[in-house]
Amino acid sequence: MLSKQKMARINELAKKAKSSGLTKEEALEQQQLRREYIQVFRKAMEDMLHSVTVIDPNGNDVTPKKLKESQKSRLH
């Protein structure tokens, strides 16, 4: 998870970009922070998906084969 300070800085830069614009240094900082945020978000989403099992209305496991294989490989 991204630190509260980094999240606050992302929001601060977004507000400043809308109101008065960013300097080149601030724009680069914003891009780097956004990349880091997206990387953390994607990792969390991937971890969440690896804990998912899809069950149809009849109670059958219909989890996609590719996901099952990925889940098995993470266990070993």
From Swiss-Prot:
Record family assignment: Belongs to the UPF0291 family.
Keywords: Cytoplasm
Feature: compositional bias, Basic and acidic residues: 63-76
GO CC annotations, alphabetized: cytoplasm
Superkingdom, taxonomy of origin: Bacteria
Localization: Cytoplasm
Pfam families per record: DUF896
Annotated signal peptide: none
Chief location of this protein within or outside the cell: cytoplasm
Species this protein is from: Geobacillus sp. (strain WCH70)
Taxonomic placement: Bacteria, Bacillati, Bacillota, Bacilli, Bacillales
Disulphide connectivity of cysteines: none
Chain residue ranges for the region called Disordered: 54-76
Protein name according to UniProt: UPF0291 protein GWCH70_1239
